């Protein structure tokens, strides 16, 4: 949720953010109206409750002759209070709906526009232009690493098995990411992958893209698409001690996405699948520290990308492609030779106070007063990275060189085609 103080004092800033995202600025006026209506209803109800309390006291001290009219008035006030409290509930519901409809206010400097309006911040390494390169699926099958056919037989399209050294490659990648996180002060976690609806709402995943989420019918739970969700809910309703700096967590989990809006996109291989594994960094900090923490998360992602030795670029994602919770997002995209394009391997988002406000996560400032915390998240490794590793390290004979950092996990320096 956005900050109501900002909304009331500078609604134009919120309107500009909405326009940069390509979203409706009229939602800002709708929230202002709902906010004013809610406050008016609360004021009326409070006045009636005070009058009812005074009337009740006067009845107790009245003489028998004075009591009948006072009792009638007390009864009238009780009915009015009941009606006013019903109005409060209705006004609160309308206000909450209007509040939830507005995306986070973007950070200054975020490019306006949609998916193609990003800004390139850095390019690392030279893209490889191989003669007749094989794609990751052809390589994965010939090397005995990926089995899409049996994945589809067991579970349907966009499912797969990682087998043999394919499984070791992914496990090694995730262990490498977790070690990097722990070495930098992250607390390792293996979180639940089924969460309550209020946690999904709190993180912003039941908004415009709710159709991407798997729901477990009958249990009222949702499968997460990232461990950002349970980690954001981890401290919901709590007051944190941030006096010694940010709290950092690394979540290792399976992730699930319906890919409902991706019909016909990336149907080959493991670029876009329904289930994958990921190590996600998550940070709680003060709002003043959020931008610095965002840069640090990006730095750790870049360290991981250096370890898998692939060319990549860093982009500043445009406002219309941020998602509702992020105020700014950096993506790292690796070069994929067979596509002749960069594809996303990591995202890191500064969600400012948007998620924490929804989830009632606070900290105490220097004076001891509770304030809304800031939250950030960032990918440290995921299954899709295998695509970049296989394609960028393939050799003319069909083998693939294992990046040096992953050799201890995989057990060989070169992945050879299986008979």
Curated annotation (Swiss-Prot):
ATP binds at residues 257-259, 273, 344-347. It comes from the Bacteria. It is an enzyme of class 6 (ligase). Pathway: Aminoacyl-tRNA biosynthesis; selenocysteinyl-tRNA(Sec) biosynthesis; L-seryl-tRNA(Sec) from L-serine and tRNA(Sec): step 1/1. InterPro entries: aa-tRNA-synt_IIb (IPR002314), aa-tRNA-synth_II (IPR006195), aa-tRNA-synth_II/BPL/LPL (IPR045864), Ser-tRNA-ligase_type_1 (IPR002317), Ser-tRNA-synth_1_N (IPR015866), SerRS_1_N_sf (IPR042103), SerRS_core (IPR033729), tRNA-bd_arm (IPR010978). Gene3D superfamilies: Bira Bifunctional Protein, Domain 2, Serine-tRNA synthetase, tRNA binding domain. GO terms for cellular component: cytoplasm; plasma membrane. Keywords: Acetylation, Aminoacyl-tRNA synthetase, ATP-binding, Cytoplasm, Ligase, Nucleotide-binding, Protein biosynthesis. Coiled coil: none annotated. It catalyses: tRNA(Ser) + L-serine + ATP = L-seryl-tRNA(Ser) + AMP + diphosphate + H(+); tRNA(Sec) + L-serine + ATP = L-seryl-tRNA(Sec) + AMP + diphosphate + H(+). The modification N6-acetyllysine is found at residue 329. GO terms for biological process: selenocysteine biosynthetic process; seryl-tRNA aminoacylation. Its EC number is 6.1.1.11. It holds the Pfam family tRNA-synt_2b. GO terms for molecular function: ATP binding; serine-tRNA ligase activity; tRNA binding. Homodimer. The tRNA molecule binds across the dimer. Catalyzes the attachment of serine to tRNA(Ser). Is also able to aminoacylate tRNA(Sec) with serine, to form the misacylated tRNA L-seryl-tRNA(Sec), which will be further converted into selenocysteinyl-tRNA(Sec). NCBIfam families: serS. Belongs to the class-II aminoacyl-tRNA synthetase family. Type-1 seryl-tRNA synthetase subfamily. Consists of two distinct domains, a catalytic core and a N-terminal extension that is involved in tRNA binding. This is Serine--tRNA ligase. It comes from Mycobacterium tuberculosis (strain ATCC 25618 / H37Rv).
């Amino acid at each position: 949720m956005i900050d109501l103080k900002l909304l009331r004092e500078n609604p134009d800033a919120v309107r500009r953010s909405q326009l940069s995202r390509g979203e409706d600025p009229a939602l800002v006026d709708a929230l202002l109206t709902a906010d004013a209506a809610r406050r008016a209803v609360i004021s009326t109800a409070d006045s009636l409750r005070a009058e009812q309390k005074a009337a009740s006291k006067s009845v107790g001290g009245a003489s028998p002759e004075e009591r009948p009219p006072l009792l009638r008035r007390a009864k009238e006030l009780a009915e009015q209070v009941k009606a006013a409290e019903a109005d409060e509930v209705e006004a609160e519901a309308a206000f909450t709906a209007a509040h939830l409809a507005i995306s986070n206010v973007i950070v200054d400097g975020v490019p306006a526009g949609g998916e193609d309006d990003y800004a390139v911040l850095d390019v690392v390494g030279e893209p490889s232009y191989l003669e007749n390169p094989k794609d990751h699926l052809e390589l994965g099958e010939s090397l005995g690493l990926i089995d899409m056919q049996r994945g589809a037989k067991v579970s349907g399209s966009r499912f797969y098995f990682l087998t043999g050294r394919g499984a070791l490659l992914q496990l090694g990648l995730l262990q490498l990411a977790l070690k990097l996180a722990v070495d930098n002060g992250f607390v390792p976690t293996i979180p639940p992958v089924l969460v309550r609806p209020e946690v999904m709402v709190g993180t912003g995943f039941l908004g415009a893209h709710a159709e991407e989420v798997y729901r477990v019918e009958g249990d009222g739970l949702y499968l997460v698409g990232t461990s950002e969700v349970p980690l954001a809910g981890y401290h919901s309703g709590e007051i944190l001690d941030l006096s010694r700096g940010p709290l950092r967590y690394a979540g290792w989990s399976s992730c699930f996405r319906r890919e409902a809006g991706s019909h016909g996109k990336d149907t080959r291989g493991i670029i876009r699948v329904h289930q994958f594994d990921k190590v996600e960094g998550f940070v709680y900090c003060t709002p003043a520290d959020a931008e610095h923490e965002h840069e640090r998360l990006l730095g750790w992602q870049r360290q991981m990308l250096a370890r898998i030795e692939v060319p990549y670029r860093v982009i500043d994602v445009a406002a219309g492609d941020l998602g509702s919770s992020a105020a700014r997002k950096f993506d790292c995209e690796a070069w994929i030779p067979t596509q002749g394009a960069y594809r996303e391997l990591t995202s890191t988002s500064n969600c400012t106070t948007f998620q924490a406000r929804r989830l009632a996560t606070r900290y105490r400032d220097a004076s001891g007063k509770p304030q809304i915390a800031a939250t950030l998240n960032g990918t440290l490794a995921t299954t899709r990275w295998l695509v970049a590793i296989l394609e960028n390290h393939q050799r003319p004979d069909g083998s693939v060189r294992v990046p040096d950092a992953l050799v201890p996990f995989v057990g060989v320096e070169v992945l050879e085609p299986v008979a």
